[in-house]
Amino acid sequence: MRKILMFLIACVAVSFTASATPSWEINSKGAIQWNVDKAQLPHKDHVEMSGELMAFVLRWAINADGVLDLDRSLVFPMLRTIPNDTHASLMHRLNTDITSMVSVEEKSLYNEATKFVEIDGMFRVVSIFDEAVEVERIIFPSMDKPFMCERYVLKNLQDDEVKVYIPEFKQNITTLPECGVDGSYLISASIQGAGTYKLKSGESLTFDAVFQACRLTEAPQVADVDAEYAARRAFVENDIDSALILATPDQVVNTMFRYAKIRASESIFKTSGGYMHAPGGESYYAAIWANDQAEYVNPFFPYLGYAVGNESAMNSFRHFARFMNDEWKPIPSSIIAEGKDIWNGAGDRGDAAMIAYGASRYALAMGDKTVAKELWPLIEWCLEYCDRKLNDGGVVTSDTDELENRFPSGEANLCTSSLYYDALLSSAYLASELAMNPSVAKDYRKKAETLRRNIDSYFAKEMYEYDTYQYYDGNDLLRSWICIPLTVGIMDRAEGTIEALFSEYLWHKDGLLTQQGTSTYWDRSTLYGLRGVYAAGASDLATEKLKYYSHRRLLEDHVPYAIEAWPEGSQRHLSAESGLYCRVLTEGLFGIRPTGLRSFELKPSLPSEWDAISLYNIKAFGSDFSLNVTRREGGKLEITVTPAGGAVKKYLIRNGQSLKVNL
């Protein structure tokens, strides 16, 4: 059998290297910046940002002359359209050119030369007009109002005084009454800060453009853009930057992790059905899914400790719990329209396994017995549902999987059974924490042991000389989801699986192909794959691919977040994928696996090129603590656990060894 070490060498033939001159760089503030005079033009890209009451996708382009163009796709998830289905958020695109309406010394402020673009929870562009005036744009969503804000700062670069004319401007669009759940909606754009100004040399003035929507029976609001800007900065600096801080020797990985925290946390909407985390992408709002929310992002929020994130996680589980039933009908895949309707168009996708997996991990990581008790009935129901879906081979059947028939998944797929396996183990830990009869935990562990054997006997298969898995019975093409067993601790075929994942059949310049022989990729499987390879102990290979992927997503042609897929959706910045990126580090590199409300297993996988890694201000397990992993002599790792206000604990283990940590 080929060894991982030899495989690393062979990987060179199918690896991809990042550009020697990246379009973007990380500036002194820790933000990503693209200096236009260093880049090849023209260039275009798109980025999504969200607040509680609106989101937008900003499509921006810089032409061959260095001139910026902005196209705003506005989304208002709580202004519902007809039919009131998954995609029924009010949406409208506006290409209004604000600066062209401004005059400087009687000349239209038009065709500025763009100097640089910066993204850091906001979109910032600095340009120069006529070598006389610097124009700074700062674009961001309101955190709690239906506003997209654009702040413009004009600075006089000349020695002489200049006159600046900011016009009064208002643009109103009224939608058709028959198209809205609440009748007509009003979409408006306006300028705040109109007037005629004189700027001496070096002086600046600020004005704002605000894009918003409301019901026709309501009046547009006057935005306090100073307050909105401060609130957005507070979200980034206080909620995101003050917790779960990653420190590795690689600046790109550290920065990508920070950006992933932003995107994973911002896409939460305050609906009539409570806070709902939503994927986004101009399609999926005011709704939840068993995979995106329950499985992907909810288990991440306890580590960050973001209160709105945790509230959205609990709200999603409460919504799913509404559909438990005595007839053992499947829980819907998605609860849509602010909780008022469901979507189950793909049938049973293994949703109960997704929910059990996510809810049990979430309950343990939260470290709150009240939360655990509330979630237990849902977890228990989902486990029983999965048990009732076992086929003659002892694995879980479903109609499809999370890809919803985009690719075949057979009667039973590897993903669903692997998630059920992990949920059984988590639930055994949880049952013990809740002081249930010891037979409950014992029964779940016994079922997990049996399922693990069945997964191997049913799915294990030599595929193209790799000792790995078929995704479903009869599957004869390699699939990216063969990585799933690695993420749940099933290492029986780790070596062959890792070789297959990074072979010429599956590894692509944008990550893992969904299926051998296609050009389709979904970031979710790449991110699961990276986590699984770390869990398997192949830290050098995992780090090589993580660094490549992070550079690709953060600093190259489409930035700055993990994406959904290609070609479907044009690489939308769906939010939960950023949660999966963070979990590559927390659960993969650091190897954190919840085992109790105040305990976890730690199995760091430190690559040979790094001597130390740290994770500061972890909010999980009802605590606030930091982890430091440092290489010592003899191949040992020193683990330092530092609780906030508590006694420091130090351990010495071998690289790849597990450690039980009690807080």
What annotation goes with each model-predicted range?
Residues 1-21:
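Bacterial Sec-dependent N-terminal signal peptides
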Residues 19-255, 305, 538-541, 550, ...:
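Terminal accessory carbohydrate-recognition/targeting modules of carbohydrate-active enzymes
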Residues 198-225, 282-286, 332-354, 384-449, ...:
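The feature captures the catalytic groove of carbohydrate-active enzymes
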Residues 237-373, 400-404, 472-488, 502, ...:
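Substrate-binding groove/exosite segments of carbohydrate-active enzymes
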Residues 257, 261-264, 441-459, 549:
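Short amphipathic alpha-helical coiled-coil/interface segments
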Residues 268-271, 324-329, 387-397, 457-464, ...:
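Proline-centered turn/helix-capping motifs that create local helix->coil transitions or kinks
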Residues 289-314, 318, 377-380, 404-405, ...:
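Active-site core of glycosidic bond-cleaving carbohydrate-active enzymes
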Residues 324, 366, 383-386, 390, ...:
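Alpha-helical junction/boundary sensor with strong preference for TPR arrays
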